Each structure stands twice: as C-alpha cells, then as structure tokens.
Curated annotation (Swiss-Prot):
The lineage of its organism: Bacteria, Bacillati, Actinomycetota, Actinomycetes, Kitasatosporales. Belongs to the D-alanine--D-alanine ligase family. One of its GO terms (biological process) is peptidoglycan biosynthetic process. Mg(2+) 2 binds at residues 348, 350. Its EC number is 6.3.2.4. It is found in: Cytoplasm. This is D-alanine--D-alanine ligase. The keyword ATP-binding applies. It comes from the Bacteria. It comes from Streptomyces griseus subsp. griseus (strain JCM 4626 / CBS 651.72 / NBRC 13350 / KCC S-0626 / ISP 5235).
Amino acid sequence: MSSENLPQSPERAESPQAPRRKPRVAVVFGGRSSEHGISVVTAGAVMRAIDRTTYDVLPIGITTDGRWALTADEPERMAITDRKVPDVDRLTESAEGSVVLSVDPGSREVVYTEPGSVPKALGEVDVVFPVLHGPYGEDGTLQGLLELSGVPYVGAGVLASAVGQDKEYMKRVFLSFGLPVGPYEVVRPREWDNDPAAARERIVDFAGEHGWPLFIKPARGGSSMGITKVDSVEGLDAAIEEARRHDPKFLVESLLRGREIECGVLEFEDGPRASVPAEIPPVTSHDFYDFEAKYIDSAAGLVPAPLTEEQTAEVRRLAVAAFDAVSCEGLVRADFFLTEDGTFVINEINTLPGFTPISMYPRMWQESGVDYPELVDRLIQAALSRSTGLR
C-alpha cells in the first residue's frame, strides 16, 4: 500500500477553541479462525452502519496467518458473492505491510510498517470494534491486548469472552447459576490422544443413556462450523475427526426435541435488556441450522417468535440471567431450546454475534425498536464510556 493511499492521521485539536476531532473507530476483523470469512462479512455490515459524520473509521484486517493489515475502506467488497465468503488477503493492497498497535497504555497509537519503508504513524485510535469470530479474537485474546494497550473496545471483557467461547466452561457457569442446561459430555485433547477407545466408549454410553442422534461439535468454535449430526455409531469417527479439525477439544450433546429460540441482550445505561425473541424454524434442506443454512442459503428466522406472553417473558429473563452469569458487557445473543414439555434450555451464548445483513441479533433489536445504525452507535458509545482494566 503506497504512502499516498494510507489513511491520514486525524488532526489533534490545537486549542480549547479548536473543533474536537471525531472519535476514531478501528474495526478489526478477519483473523486466524475458521470463521475468518464471516468475520469479514460482519465487518462490512458494521462499517456501512457507522455514521461517518460522527466517527472516523480505520479498517484493520487480520489475515489467516495472523498479519494485521491495513485494508481499504470499501465495505461493499466485504460481502458474500456467488456463495463465497471474502477474505482479508483480497482486501489489502500490500502483501507485506503490517499495522502495529502500541501496547503503551498512554499512547493508543497505530503505526503502519512495510519492509524497506519508514514506519508511518496513523494516529490514535479511540475505540476498537472487534468483529473477530472464534479463536484468536472472540475468545479473550484480542481483548487482553486491548486491555494492555488501554484502548476501549466494544463487547465483553477478557473473562466473559473466554468463557463465552469455550462451551464446556460456559455450561459449567450456567449450571452454577441455576440455568437449565441440556445433557452433554466433554472430550479433552489428552483424553482422546491417550486413549481414544475409552473416550469413544464413553460417547457410546452417553448415546445409550440419552439416545441417538448426537451432535459432535468443537468446544471453542462458532457459526456451526465443524458440527456434525450423528445418527448411529457408524458415523462417530468421521464426526469426531471433523470437530477436531477445528478444535482438539470437542463436545457431545444429545438432541433436544423442540423449537430453537434466540434472544438478544444489549447493555443500556440502566443495565442489560433483552430484545423480542426470534425462532429458527426447522430447516428442511439441512440436517440442522448449520453454516450454510445460516449464511449461504439465508434461512429466515421468525421475528418475533410466536410465543405466549409468559414464554416471551421467561426467555427474556433467562437471556439477561445468562448475560449476568458470564459477566458480559455490551451485547450477547442467547440461544435456547423450547422443549416439548414447555421448558427452556439454554444452549449457548455468543459474545460477538453475527452482524451480517441476515443475522438474527440486529433483526431482533430492529423489531424491538433499535435499528441497525442505532445499535452500532450504542455499542460504540458504551465502549467509549467504559474504562479498561478492573471494573
């Protein structure tokens, strides 16, 4: 990326009378996880929604090999086309240039470096809007870096992000707070590596107790990637291999028969509030609500969900309770099953839910009276008003 194409550093106010510059939002996206492409799509939607009369935007893409790259501010290129998701490598003009964020908590300075060139200061960042899904971004790693740097950021902190990414510990926290959780087993890397036969036998015993089919899923994944529905023991090995391709630790869950219900939580000045819930209807073209159903085939959810007043109140209460149990901040999407006996069971939360044009989280808040641009603005303003460090 040539120097003339680099974004200009925002002007500092030289006197109390000088106009204050607009807050600068760094939208960080991409990353090393298998959800790289969806992160790019989400970032494009967020960038389109940010009010440019109020904020400056600095797009920072992280390549699949972990390089922080300066990308063009062209959100229209960050969309699913021809059933293909975009990636950061196609959005950056330099294969070698890197963006560096200072870890000096008094700086907030961003610098662009390229081999053979003098580093160029890009100015300070006031707030980071991370839209990294999955490991190396949504799991507390990026949040830890931003805490070290003293840069405010949208969404959950280090602990809540880590718990929200690891389905095992998420369920443990839910259970400790008395939230209803379905049957599950965890197979850790050492268990599988040391004695896969014993681990496999434990899974078969779990199926004997709770019945087939089972869902085999990565413990620290998202967007339904790496999840397989297994109808019998014959499909078990392939499903485990697929899950471990995304994460060496995996979960085994029984099928909960019922309806899939989602609810958004957003932090307001007076505390977290829940949106109207949505329902994911059965997807006849897929075994379950998998990656393609979510993002490629545009499976439509029902917003609001056709629930009774009592059911709506209960799922909203549980969503806020899950938000509080994990000590979340900013936003969460909570996913539930409404079982055949009429009880809600929490499946998981997402601390950085998708913001693609068809994502359920913004749709639920749209129906609740908070449109997409206001939703993005509320999240940025909440981050700007919140300090880093212990809070």
